Regions:
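Catalytic Walker B motif of ABC-type/P-loop ATPase nucleotide-binding domains
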Residues: 165-168
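Conserved ABC ATPase "signature" C-loop
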Residues: 219-220
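Conserved ABC ATPase signature
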Residues: 139-144, 148
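Short helical segment in ABC ATPase nucleotide-binding domains corresponding to the A-loop/adjacent helical element
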Residues: 101-110, 119, 123
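Conserved catalytic motifs of ABC-family nucleotide-binding domains
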Residues: 161
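Conserved ABC ATPase "signature" region
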Residues: 116-135, 188
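Helix-to-loop junction immediately C-terminal to a conserved catalytic motif
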Residues: 56
Length: 255
C-alpha cells in the first residue's frame, strides 16, 4: 500500500473513547519525526499511555488516523508492527528465571535470528548500556541494582534493532541520583543511535532534559508541542504551571 505520510508517526484528528460516555483522547494532531525523541508530558490520566497503545495498535482510534512509518495503523499486521517497536517500561518486566543474556536475547530469538547474530547483538547492546557481557550476562535480575535492571530493560528494547522505541516512565522508580545518571546515559545513546522515541513522563525536568520536543497532554487534549526552550516560554496556562513547578525545584505536578 502506498505510504500516506513521510513522518515516522502521525496522529490525524485522533480521538479515543473507553466507553460511549468516557473520552480519553480528543482531536490529537501531531507528528513524530524520524530520529526524534518526543516527550509526552502530563499527569496521570491525561492519556499519555493511551497514545502509546494507539501507536502499537493495542488500541484502535474511535476516530481519526494513527500512521506509523507511512501506513495507517489499521493497515498494519499487528504482529509485524509490534516487531518494529522496542519497549521500555517502569517495572522493566524482566523474567526473573532468565539470565541477563537470556532476557536480552528473547526478542531476537523470537525473530528467528541465527545463533551467532543473537550472541553478537546481545554483547553489543549490553556494551552500549554499560553492562559488559563478561560481567553481567550470567546474572539474574535479583542480582542487579534497580539502575542495572533498567539498563537491561533498555538493552532488551534495542536488541532486535527496532525502528521505534516506546518508553513509559522507564526511570520513574529509580532514586534521584541513579535516575539522573541513566537519563544522561540514555541521552548520549540516543544521540548515537537516533531512534524514533516516544517517551511518557510526568516529570517536567525529565522532559526538558531528554526531549527534542515536548507534547503536553491535559485531560486527553494536546495543549502545546514545542522544543524545550520554547516550552519554557509557552503562553499556555497548563504549560506555565509545569514551568513554575520546574523552577521551584519540584519534579512534577500532583498526580
Amino acid at each position: 500500500m502506498k505510504n500516506i505520510s513521510d513522518n515516522a508517526i502521525e496522529f490525524r484528528g485522533v480521538a479515543y473513547k473507553a466507553s460511549p460516555d468516557r473520552t480519553v483522547l480528543a482531536d490529537l494532531n501531531f507528528v513524530v519525526e524520524r530520529g526524534e525523541t518526543l516527550m509526552l508530558l502530563g499527569r496521570s490520566g491525561s492519556g499519555k499511555t493511551t497514545v502509546l497503545r494507539l501507536i502499537n495498535r493495542l488500541l484502535i482510534p474511535s476516530s481519526g488516523d494513527v500512521c506509523v512509518d507511512g501506513k495507517r495503523s489499521g493497515d498494519w499486521n499487528p504482529i509485524q508492527l509490534r516487531r518494529r517497536i522496542g519497549y521500555a517500561i517502569q517495572d522493566v518486566g524482566l523474567f526473573p528465571h532468565y539470565t541477563v543474556w537470556q532476557n536480552v536475547a528473547l526478542v531476537p530469538k523470537l525473530e528467528r535470528w541465527d545463533a551467532r547474530r543473537v550472541s553478537d547483538r546481545v554483547e553489543e547492546v549490553l556494551e552500549l548500556v554499560g553492562l559488559p557481557g563478561r560481567d553481567f550476562a550470567g546474572r539474574y535480575p535479583d542480582q542487579l541494582s534497580g539502575g542495572q535492571r533498567q539498563r537491561v530493560g533498555l538493552a532488551r528494547a534495542l536488541a532486535a534493532e527496532p525502528s521505534f522505541l516506546l518508553m513509559d516512565e522507564p526511570f520513574g522508580a529509580l532514586d534521584p541520583l541513579t535516575r539522573a545518571e541513566i537519563q544522561g546515559e540514555f541521552k548520549k545513546l540516543q544521540q548515537k543511535l537516533k531512534k524514533t522515541v516516544v517517551f511518557v513522563t510526568h516529570d517536567v525536568g525529565e522532559a526538558l532534559t531528554l526531549g527534542d520536543r515536548i507534547a503536553l497532554l491535559e485531560a486527553g487534549r494536546l495543549r502545546t508541542i514545542d522544543v524545550p526552550d520554547n516550552f519554557l516560554q509557552s503562553s499556555d496556562a497548563v504549560a506555565q504551571m509545569y514551568v513554575s513547578v520546574y523552577r521551584t525545584g519540584q519534579q512534577a505536578l500532583p498526580r
